[in-house]
UniProtKB/Swiss-Prot annotation:
Pfam families: dsrm, Ribonucleas_3_3. Residues 254-290 are annotated as: Disordered. Its EC number is 3.1.26.3. HAMAP family: RNase_III. It comes from the Bacteria. Residues 173-242 form the DRBM domain. One of its GO terms (cellular component) is cytoplasm. Residues 20-145 form the RNase III domain. Residues 267-279 have a biased composition (Polar residues). Belongs to the ribonuclease III family. This is Ribonuclease 3. It catalyses: Endonucleolytic cleavage to 5'-phosphomonoester. The gene is rnc. It comes from Bacteroides fragilis (strain YCH46).
Length: 290
């Protein structure tokens, strides 16, 4: 409390006091290193570079914030739901840290109005707000530490915007979300039951794999086929979001799967050239939203 009063007095003499006040309204405290928060809201499409020529955006902070957010929300959920099993806690945490929820939270606290991005670029997607939220968490962690970060989530996010008990009862269909994503991006998705066994108490256990364009996305187990599919779909969605190498492999496989068989006749060669040009155009302009 005293620290905030001191920061407020110092703020009167700063040229950038408007930015500090803006972040204070969101955070409930004044930043010590405001540059961290500004970078957290800097989308890669702006193509801003540091004095050393390195790209300056929020991707590294997003990476850090993703890990910190998982830990903090796991901590909060663990304390709130005393005695609940690991599977329940994992699912509840997933509902909070999923991209759609983070998008909404970013809008609720006003981050969407502060994000800087290039309107000329089509590289940003519908998850830009959620990504910025994660980067913002990373900035808080570096600026103030874990405990302050946890207090921000509890007092400024969970209490005003999330009913944990109600959320825990809400069922999220990860399989439907994955299928919806695949249809939007014209990707072939398959669910394969690869193993069925019994646990120590002779309960049936199922294991399912998800493949996108033939590339393994995720594997999940469960006490029913539906549960194993849901877990596999959830893992695949996380991989789509956070594994660029996986998505590059999927795109390459999709391109190869769409290449037509060769024909040596002059007419077919001309047709094949035209088709390849069309495919190249589609690939070059297609955006995968994850």
């Amino acid at each position: 409390m005293l620290r905030n009063k001191i920061d407020k007095i110092r703020l009167l003499f700063r040229k950038d006091r408007e930015s500090y006040s803006c972040f204070y309204r969101i955070l409930g405290f004044y930043p010590r290193n405001i540059r961290l928060y500004e970078q957290a809201l800097l989308h890669k499409s702006t193509a801003v570079r540091s004095e050393k020529g390195r790209p300056l955006n929020n991707e590294r902070l997003e990476f850090l914030g993703d890990a910190i957010l998982d830990a903090i929300v796991g901590d909060i959920v663990y304390q709130h739901f005393e005695g609940k099993r690991e599977g329940f806690l994992t699912n509840t945490r997933s509902k909070i840290v999923q991209r759609e929820t983070l998008n909404k939270l970013a809008v609720e606290i006003g981050l969407d109005k502060l994000i800087k991005y290039s309107t000329r670029s089509s590289s940003h997607n519908s998850y830009m707000y959620g990504n910025a939220f994660e980067a913002f968490i990373g900035a808080i962690y570096l600026d103030r530490g874990y405990e302050c970060c946890k207090q921000f989530m509890e007092r400024r996010i969970i209490e005003p915007y999330i009913d944990l008990d109600k959320l825990s009862r809400k069922e999220v269909n990860f399989k439907s979300k994955l299928i919806e994503w695949s249809q939007k991006n014209k990707m072939e998705v398959s669910f394969e039951l690869i193993e069925q066994s019994l646990d120590k108490e002779n309960n049936p256990v199922f294991q399912t794999e998800v493949r996108i364009e033939g590339i393994l996305g995720g594997s999940g187990t469960g006490y029913s086929k539906k549960e194993s599919q849901q877990n596999a779909a959830q893992m695949t969605l996380k991989k789509i979001k956070g594994d660029p190498e996986f998505m590059a492999s999927v795109q390459e496989a999709k391109t190869q799967n769409n290449v037509p068989a060769e024909d040596t006749t002059p007419e077919s060669e001309m047709s094949l050239t035209a088709e390849n040009q069309q495919i190249d155009e589609i690939i070059s302009t297609e955006e995968i939203s994850v």
